[in-house]
């Protein structure tokens, strides 16, 4: 049955490609124009929410722990900081409108009112890029430098490393784990507890990072769009069979390298062109299999797009233009290498 669903999905994409601009379809799949795939994005959002909750909860456990009775001033500052984090969490991650439609952790989005989906769609990206999530990701980046020690709960980083401060939370240097750990007021049990808190804080931050890194995109849909668009356009451009075959046979690169493409996409500030640029770059870098004939065919395909746009007196989408320029530049490099 699942296979039949995928076939119908591909048939729908094939039909849609005939009637829509391919780049617009690409934008829709990526979600760069506000469209999101709820079946992918909602579970991702929940994972981020859960890991953020765990991160703040761990700090709350530390604040209430008996070991902090020895550090009255630090305890007060940590209590205020945790309160601010909880307030931010409530503001960013409470979506009871969708949650009330969950049954056994699953949501039938066909039953969710459109206004609820639209509200979530509008707010989703600002939530996962919020100051709270950014703070935790920066905390993760700091702690990841000491990954091996923390995962082994090795106190080396709090005892031997140079410096007097080990503060893993940006903008909150008052939480100095090195100071807490090395205090004469602590028993060995207290020291072990502090190291355990640091370990749990890191694993929760890693949970946020791993959830953020989940693509918002169905890679198979993206592959189908590329293949369907190629099958449509190659009927209109004769004598470019080898170039089209090269594109079609290289679609596997999209799936193979997609996590890297997606990381670049997020790092670029969600510029959707990045994914296609990196994909075409990977195709064109296989210079052993790109003969002068195939290079010429690629140029013919590019010229077709340019002529089609000029005929319709349209201004080329800047993102498409950048993509075309990138391909042309790569082809020029390959031509020079073969001379």
From Swiss-Prot:
<keyword id="KW-0945">Host-virus interaction</keyword>
<dbReference type="GO" id="GO:0030430">
    <property type="term" value="C:host cell cytoplasm"/>
</dbReference>
<keyword id="KW-1048">Host nucleus</keyword>
<protein>
    <recommendedName>
        <fullName>Protein H339R</fullName>
    </recommendedName>
</protein>
<comment type="similarity">
    <text>Belongs to the asfivirus H339R family.</text>
</comment>
<keyword id="KW-0426">Late protein</keyword>
<keyword id="KW-1035">Host cytoplasm</keyword>
<dbReference type="GO" id="GO:0042025">
    <property type="term" value="C:host cell nucleus"/>
</dbReference>
<comment type="subunit">
    <text>Interacts with host NACA (alpha chain of nascent polypeptide-associated complex).</text>
</comment>
């Amino acid at each position: 049955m699942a296979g039949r669903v995928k076939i119908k999905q591909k048939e729908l994409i094939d039909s849609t490609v005939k009637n829509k601009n391919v780049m617009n379809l690409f934008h829709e799949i990526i979600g760069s124009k506000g469209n999101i795939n709820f079946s992918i994005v909602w579970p991702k959002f929940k994972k981020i929410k859960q890991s953020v909750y765990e991160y703040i909860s761990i700090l709350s456990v530390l604040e209430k722990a008996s070991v902090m009775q020895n550090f009255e001033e630090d305890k007060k500052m940590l209590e205020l900081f945790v309160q601010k984090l909880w307030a931010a969490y409530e503001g960013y991650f409470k979506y009871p409108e969708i949650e009330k439609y969950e049954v056994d952790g699953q949501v039938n989005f066909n039953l969710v009112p459109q206004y609820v989906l639209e509200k979530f769609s509008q707010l989703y990206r600002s939530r996962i890029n919020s100051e709270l999530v950014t703070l935790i990701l920066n905390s993760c980046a700091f702690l990841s430098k000491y990954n091996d020690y923390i995962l082994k709960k090795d106190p080396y980083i709090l005892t031997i490393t140079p410096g007097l401060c080990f503060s893993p939370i940006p903008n909150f240097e008052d939480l100095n784990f090195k100071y807490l750990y090395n205090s004469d007021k602590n028993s060995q049990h207290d020291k072990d507890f502090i190291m355990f808190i640091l370990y749990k804080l890191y694993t929760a931050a890693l949970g946020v990072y791993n959830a953020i890194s989940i693509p918002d995109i169905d890679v198979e849909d993206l592959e189908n769009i590329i293949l369907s668009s190629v099958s449509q356009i190659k009927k209109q451009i004769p004598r470019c069979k080898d170039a089209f075959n090269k594109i079609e046979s290289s679609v596997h690169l999209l799936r193979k390298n997609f996590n890297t493409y997606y990381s670049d996409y997020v790092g670029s500030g969600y510029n959707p062109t990045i994914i296609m640029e990196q994909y075409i770059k990977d195709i064109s870098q296989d210079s052993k299999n790109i003969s002068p004939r195939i290079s010429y065919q690629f140029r013919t395909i590019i010229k077709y797009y340019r002529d089609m746009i000029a005929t319709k007196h349209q201004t080329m989408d800047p993102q498409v233009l950048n993509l075309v320029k990138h391909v042309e530049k790569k082809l020029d490099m390959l031509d020079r290498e073969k001379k």
